[in-house]
Amino acid sequence: MGQIVGSMHMNVAEVFSNRRKRKRSTDSSLGKDDPAQLDTTQPKKKKLLTTTQYIYKALFKEEKNSDVAVMALDKVWHLHKVYLSQSPYFYTMFNGTWREAQQNFIQITILDDRITVASLDAVFGSMYSDEIEIESADVISVLATATLFHLDGIIDKCAEVMVDNISPETAIQYYEAACQYGVVGVKKSTFQWFQINLLSIYSKQPNLLRHISIELMSALTASPDLYVMQTEFSLYTLLRTWMFLRLHPDYDPEDPVQRAEALKTQELLVNAGVETHAPSGDVVQWTYFTSRSEERSFLATPEGQPYVKVFQKLRTQYLTNHYMDLKIIYNDNIIPKEWLYRHIHNHWDALLRIDHGQEDCSPQQLDDEQFFENCMRCGRMLLEPGYQKWRWTGFNFGMDLILIMDSRRLNIRRHHRHEHERVLSLQTKRKFMVRTTVTSINAQRQAVFTQTSEICSLSLEKNEEVPLMVLDPKLVHPLLISINMLVVMPPNQSFKEIVPLSEEATTSLSIPISEIGANSDRPLSPSSADDSAVFIGDSEPSTPSSPAPRPRIAWSASETGAICGQLAC
């Protein structure tokens, strides 16, 4: 009996074993012959909608179980009070004594033109989701909407998008929006961007330049951190163009027809013997300012009054450093002549004091505020590394200062040659104050890294060279260099607080600017602001010597004849 049971147990085991072998064999052959059938037998993993996605789809998009309708800009959203209450705006409305707390239909009057239906939809939808998609083109609208509903999280996200996308096309709008909605970080970032790029970018893009507000331009002009490329006269020409563009909002400086007319007008003026000292593209603004019959400055006219505070912030004491610059400014007659005469008097007084060795003329014991309010601002761009040497030309109280970039070190040298002793200071030592700032920028011309020195007082002997800064390894080209310098004690400039309405008496007692330095021979004198920095030695310029002429509108040929008549062509 035991043998029978044992035999049956073995037979049953063999049967099941054979079945398992056949099944494995069948499965194996099936996998080889038809993989698709094998796949159908395996379990599939399906990702279900997350709770957030379901809420967004069912409650916001499909508007299920809505308990309140919100109407704005002629569109109605069927929403839910519990989600809207994430906004302090709606929370106060639904939980206070407002009549809307008991209503299921709310109409919101939108007074801000920046708010759109799309931005409202995006902000409402964000209350049902844990994310919001913000495009740089729509960020201001979303910011305006988030500000209306006091949604700080979305405001912060908008600020991040704006800071990352500052460019010549967006900077003005971003700055104005930041001021309007109180986004301090964006306002600071855009202002810093303007300080770096105002003269480098907007001098070549007039249709963008014209949209800079008077308030912003005034703040930039006053800033000691403004990168003035090349000298203060460069900033003056930019302000002249900016003011002209704002006074003529309908004129398109990039219109090809108007540019061609400008060239014809320039040729007629040249043939008539009229010196414009301006590119053909600038002949329109040149004619507008120089052909006025009034003796008073343009700033004294009703049209010029709104711009007075901007030109008061201009360091006009550094506009009289070069004969050609002075002649152009005098002919423009934008700035009151009284300002120019006072500066010339102060320069001459300081030069006499320096020549007689008066120590009270050298800048000393000045606090930072005094230095920053009165210092000269000069700038330069270095596109590539290498040995480079340059000077900013113009009258500098008998000092010929040369900047030298050698490898990773920026030096300054008091250049003195015996053949130039008639025009250079003979004092053994000259004292001055200086601050150096170097910035590395990216493709969007945003500051990547900035290195700034302290304000230091230097005392240089003839031909002495000292280092200004050893560059940090994080500074990579292209580099922007800004020098703040004070060579003499700043004089009192309270006279700039007054813009004389009539300058006839002052003019009759003054020497014409056209006669100042008429016999001077200065081969290094720049013909314009773009030539204010002169390279020395064998080094190659790191930036073009002059930018492309800015296009301008022109008068017709018949009007040109009238212009020549007014100018005694």
Curated annotation (Swiss-Prot):
InterPro entries in the cross-refs: BTB/POZ_dom, Gcl-like, SKP1/BTB/POZ_sf
Any one Gene Ontology BP term: proteasome-mediated ubiquitin-dependent protein catabolic process
One GO term describing the cellular component: cell cortex
UniProt keywords, alphabetically: Cytoplasm, Developmental protein
Pfam families attached to this UniProt entry: BTB (PF00651)
Domain (BTB) ranges: 66-136
The keyword Iron is assigned to this record: no
Renumbered residue ranges of the record's region Disordered: 17-43, 517-553
SUPFAM superfamilies reported for this sequence: POZ domain
Coiled coil: none
Subcellular location: Cytoplasm
Any GO MF annotation of the entry: ubiquitin-like ligase-substrate adaptor activity
Protein role: Required for the specification of pole cells and germ cell formation. Mothers with reduced glc function give rise to sterile adult progeny that lack germ cells.
Protein name: Protein germ cell-less
Organism: Drosophila melanogaster (Fruit fly)
Lineage: Eukaryota, Metazoa, Ecdysozoa, Arthropoda, Hexapoda
